[in-house]
UniProtKB/Swiss-Prot annotation:
Coiled coil: none annotated. This is Uncharacterized protein At3g43530. Signal peptide: none annotated. Residues 579-589, 606-615 have a biased composition (Basic residues).
């Protein structure tokens, strides 16, 4: 275990050697091999010649080859696993030793959370050096323990296995328990149990250092909470815990959102100021050994506030931390140094130290060249394959284009031939229609007359059926006489109105005899229909006359029917009206004369044809 009070010497919390020893041996300067020191280089140059030069240490506690990873500070500890195993396997007397320990007891009664680990309890630094000065460095060396065999390399699973195999409580078992407890955190004083009690295990490293969740009020408020049942004499780690969450940890995005632009942290308390003064003050030198290396570092770092950089050690450390690709030898990266640095105010220059890693750089460059060449070769192969594929696709596209053009040309010629044939057929039909125009018109007229006959027959049959049903209804009525009288009055009025219309139509029709002759010729086809209509109208009773008028729609043939019925019944339509006798005479003439009689069915025929089309 290494520890220092000098600000320029880092804390150490881990030992590379994992063998066990019965004694604790403190190394001295005489035991350290005397080796020639390397050249020293400092970042800053003093304004005067009296500046203190930092000396390179004779030996580093951990060699460069012991660590292959870059510098890292860990902040996670799985305390709940070790504490749970000890509580379940130890006897009361053995467990009492931990519960009464001034530092270890807090691990057993603090809040145990498997997700949120205890952070910042101690710092792990890789680089530590061997010094003889008191208060600057404490470290332990071990010899092989007889329990694990001579020369055995002990690992963490071996310690756990050894602990579980020891069933009876004893001092040896307690030592193994202490070793198991410290394997994850400290590898140090195990043989001397009294020394474990008096040694300041992380006291200054924890009690006098604040975490971000403790120092920044915003983070403490949002992510931490106090434990009410904690002992007031316990340190902070027993009085605080992280808030429960559905996740194993807090995402950094949440931390950044809560933090925002906060720059406020806890100011140092008076006790902390006294502590800093006590740590940074000069040692009294009682029972102490002067160390030029430690004193030179302290004076340069604290008094002169300068930095120290040992370039050879830096290059050696980086060389062992570089990655290994494809089992290639590790390469060396030079430290970023200037070729020459001028002293302030004097203009003097100091030549830069030559780096021993030039060969490593050449190897890196050669490897990069080989990788680039191989990559470009593979890219060229792929590009050639792609070009071949594209050429094949171009050929296929050209073939498809030619096929599509041929299809389009063939379809265009077929359409031209088809349109010509259609035009020829239409011309032939037009010529035939012009030659046989009269025949076609006659055929059309004959078809129209046949259709009119069929329509007239259907209408007559429907009218006869409707009239019969109405007659049956009227026969059952008791007031048939009154109903007949009313019907006669209505018929007289309608006859008078219809005769006026007939007279006007006859005047218009008698304008030219040539037109009448043409109309008579056209109406000859409809004579049988008109005669049938007249006979049906004469054979019906007087009660059915209004219904005939309604069914026929007030056509020209209805007045003649109504007028004939009125004469047959003996009623004179001229009664009560001066103009009626003249109309009767005209009607009588129209009855004897065939011209007006033959004209009326033509109008009814065209009227029925229109109604049929509308339907």
């Amino acid at each position: 275990m290494a520890r220092t009070k000098n600000a320029g010497v880092p804390l150490a919390a881990e030992v590379v050697s994992q063998t066990i020893n019965d004694e604790v041996v403190v190394a001295s300067a005489a035991e350290v091999d005397s080796e020639a020191t390397n050249l020293i280089s400092n970042d800053d140059r003093a304004d005067s010649d009296e500046e203190t030069e930092a000396l390179q240490p004779l030996k580093m506690y951990f060699g460069p080859s012991d660590y292959t990873k870059p510098f890292k500070i860990t902040a996670k500890c799985y305390l709940h696993k070790a504490v749970g195993l000890l509580e379940s396997h130890l006897e009361e007397s053995e467990l009492k030793w931990f519960l009464e320990h001034p530092q270890f007891k807090h691990f057993f009664h603090m809040h145990k959370d498997p997700n949120h680990k205890v952070m910042g309890m101690w710092l792990l630094f890789i680089r530590t050096t061997c010094l003889d000065k008191k208060g600057s460095m404490v470290y332990c060396q071990w010899r092989t323990d007889p329990m694990f065999g001579p020369g055995a390399t002990i690992q963490y699973p071996d310690v756990e296995k050894k602990l579980l195999s020891m069933k009876k409580p004893s001092e040896a078992r307690l030592r193994v328990v202490v070793l198991y407890f410290l394997c994850n955190r400290w590898k140090g004083v195990v043989a001397d149990l009294e020394l474990c009690k008096t040694f300041p295990w992380g006291k200054n490293a924890f009690e006098e250092n604040y975490l971000a969740f403790e120092a920044i009020p915003v983070l403490r408020k949002n992510f931490c909470e106090d434990i009410e049942s904690a002992d007031p004499q316990c340190p902070r780690m027993c009085k605080m815990k992280f808030k429960s969450s559905t996740m194993k940890g807090f995402p950094m995005s949440d931390v950044y959102d809560k933090l925002g632009t906060t720059k406020s942290i806890l100011a140092p308390t008076p006790d902390e100021n006294l502590l800093l003064k006590r740590i940074m003050d000069k040692e009294c030198g009682v029972n102490d050994v002067d160390d030029l290396i430690a004193d030179g570092w302290k004076k340069r770092l604290v008094d002169e506030e300068r930095t120290i950089c040992f370039e050879p050690l830096f290059n050696e450390d980086v060389a062992h931390q570089s990655f290994v690709a494809n089992n290639a030898p590790s390469t060396v990266v030079q430290a970023p140094r200037k070729a020459a640095v001028e002293k302030k105010g004097k203009g003097k220059t100091a030549a830069a130290l030559t780096s021993p890693s030039d060969e490593g750089l050449t190897e890196v460059v050669n490897e990069m060249k080989n990788l680039m060449e191989n990559g470009f070769k593979s890219m060229n192969k792929r590009m050639t394959n792609f070009s071949k594929k594209y050429e094949e696709q171009d050929k296929r596209l050209k073939l498809m284009e030619t096929a599509i053009k041929s299809i389009q040309s063939s379809t265009g010629t077929d359409d031209a031939y088809g349109s010509k044939e259609i035009d020829d057929r239409e011309n032939e039909l037009e010529e035939g229609s012009d030659a046989n125009g009269g025949d076609n018109e006659r055929e059309v007229r004959e078809k129209e007359t046949e259709i009119d006959k069929e329509v007239a027959q259907g209408d007559n049959e429907r009218e006869v059926g409707e009239k019969e049903t109405e007659i049956d209804k009227e026969v059952g009525q008791g007031d048939s006489d009154i109903f007949d009288g009313n019907k006669d009055m209505e018929l007289n009025k309608e006859v008078a109105e219809s005769t006026i219309g007939v007279a006007e139509s006859e005047k218009d029709k008698e304008v030219t005899e040539s037109e009448k002759d043409k109309e008579v010729a056209e109406s000859e086809i409809g004579v049988p229909e008109s005669e049938k209509d007249i006979e049906v109208a004469d054979s019906e009773k007087d009660k059915e006359v209004p219904q005939d008028d309604e069914m026929d729609g007030g056509k020209v043939t209805e007045p003649s029917k109504k007028r004939g019925k009125s004469h047959d019944d003996g009623d004179d339509p001229s009664e009560g009206c001066v103009k009626k006798p003249k109309v009767v005479k005209k009607v009588a003439k129209s009855r004897t004369d065939a011209k007006p009689v033959y004209r009326s069915p033509i109008q009814t025929r065209y009227a029925r044809k229109k109604t049929k089309k509308n339907v």
